[in-house]
Amino acid sequence: MYQLSLNERCEEIEDIMKKTVLIVGVAGRFGRQCASAMRDAGWHVRGFARTTEKANCIDGVEPYVGDIMDPTALGNAADGADVIVQAANPPYQLWKTLLLEMNQAVIDVAINVGATVVVPQNVYIFGKKGGVWKEDAPHVGSNALARIRMTMEAAYKKAAINHGLPILAFRMGDFIDGPDHRPSGNWFENHITKAVATGDFTYPGPMDRDHAWAYLPDVARAIVDILNTPNAVVGHLDLNFPGWVLTGASMKTAIEHAVGKPMKRKKMPWVPMNVIALWSAPLRNVVSLRYLWNVPHRLGTDRFDRLLPHFEATDPTEAFTNRWET
């Protein structure tokens, strides 16, 4: 009878001890970066997406195909998972009809399998008054998107209180993808740096206002560090990510250093955008967030700093250089 060698036994024990994470929406920016970072940190990573191609988008990730609204498909993918990363996010125009249901589906499955949930949060809920937005800052529903997010966040807090579900609510500024970036519809790629190749830098607001940014490779690295910290996530843990605080001018300078040439500053065409927004729901939602470019803001990160006191963010110029070299 064949007996396992010592090395094979060690590998078998190692596989058993590996923690399992399910990334829901693995093909998106946030999902891809989390999947790669957790795989590299030794986690057993499962990727859940609507198509086989998307579920297989990251090497070394076990693919699961299905719809987030299908409890059987999502439940099968989550079975035995220690952590679920909720990285699925519909377009703005579908938030009203889909966002709450999608996140409730994740909550229900997480309660059933006993998994910790990591859910990314944004800054929309802080309203139009700038400054330092701390974790305990009041939530203000100043627009429709903010009110939907507030309802969604309340559902996670309710699950933590009523069911003891561990939640890592990770709040960040606007996303900036890593060197392996793929086409997406965010501010940085679709507007600000869309024409970098031709020397244009299109900024949505005044060039002297602080703006919160989240470099996703750093975000994923921080999430791994938190999840690998014993007893870090108990109940509902609301954390603000430090990220980068950049003005338009400092971002432009960093990009100029990265690409090795001066950039011509252009302004966003807000006037025609406002007109088109009268009958375009997607653009109407974009226009409703214009204030974030006029109001200087940053995230207060006291809780994060206590939890990960030695965390160091990637330098923006280094990140931009890596991005445009690839």
Where is each model-derived feature located?
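Conserved Rossmann-fold NAD(P)-dependent oxidoreductase catalytic core, especially the SDR/UDP-sugar
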Residues: 104-151, 168
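Conserved beta-strand positions in the Rossmann-like core of class I SAM-dependent methyltransferases
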Residues: 46
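Mid/C-terminal beta-alpha module of Rossmann-like enzyme folds, strongest
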Residues: 6-20, 222-286, 301, 306, ...
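Conserved beta-loop-beta element that borders a ligand/cofactor-binding pocket
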Residues: 122, 154-180
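NAD(P)-dependent short-chain dehydrogenase/reductase
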Residues: 174-210
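N-terminal Rossmann NAD(P)H-binding glycine-rich loop of SDR-like oxidoreductase domains
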Residues: 21-41
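NAD(P)H-binding glycine-rich loop region in Rossmannoid oxidoreductase-like domains
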Residues: 53-113
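Short-chain dehydrogenase/reductase
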Residues: 96-100, 131, 142-154, 181-189, ...
